[in-house]
C-alpha cells in the first residue's frame, strides 16, 4: 500500500536525498560497531514499520557535504566496522543516485569498511542495480508485521533475508550472510 503523500507527488520530481539521522556507534544494524544513515523516502508503507516518519521523501534534512563529512569522520575511526544505509528506503527512486555515489565514494576511500543496506525491495528485483557492486550485505524484503520476530538477528520479520551481496553476485544465486 502506497502512502498517500507519495501518490500526490509527481514521478518526475527529482529532489536531493534527505535524511533523518546519522547514528553513531550502532550495534543493531549490521556486524560490529557501525554508523547508520537513516534516509528519507520510502514507498513500501509497511504496516508496523519502526520508522514511518521517514516515509516522506521531503522530510528530514538535506543530505549535504556536512552530513557526508560526519559519516566520513566516523569511518575514520578504526573501531567503526562500516556504514549502514537504512531509513526510509535507500533504494527509493529519489535516493538511488545519491546513495550509489555515496557508497562508491565510501568504498574508494575506506575499502576495508563494510556497507550494509536495508531495503523493502526484493533481491530479485534489484539485482541489476549499480549500487550492489559497493554493498557487502543487503537486508531485503518488506517488513511484515505478522512475521515479526524480535529474536531475529539484523531483520524484523522472518520473510526478510540477510544477503551476502558480493558472493550472491559472483554465484548468480542468493547467498545468505552468516
Label every model-predicted segment.
Residues 7, 12-38, 51-57, 174-175:
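N-terminal [4Fe-4S]-dependent radical SAM core
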Residues 15-19, 33, 51-116, 121-128:
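Conserved Radical SAM active-site core
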Residues 16, 112, 134-135, 159:
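A generic structural signal for alpha->beta connector loops
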Residues 41-45:
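Short pre-active-site segment immediately N-terminal to redox-active cysteine/selenocysteine motifs
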Residues 76, 127-147:
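Structural recognition of alpha->loop->beta junctions
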Residues 93-99, 104-107, 148-178:
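P-loop/Walker A phosphate-binding loop and immediately adjacent motor/lid segment at beta-alpha junctions
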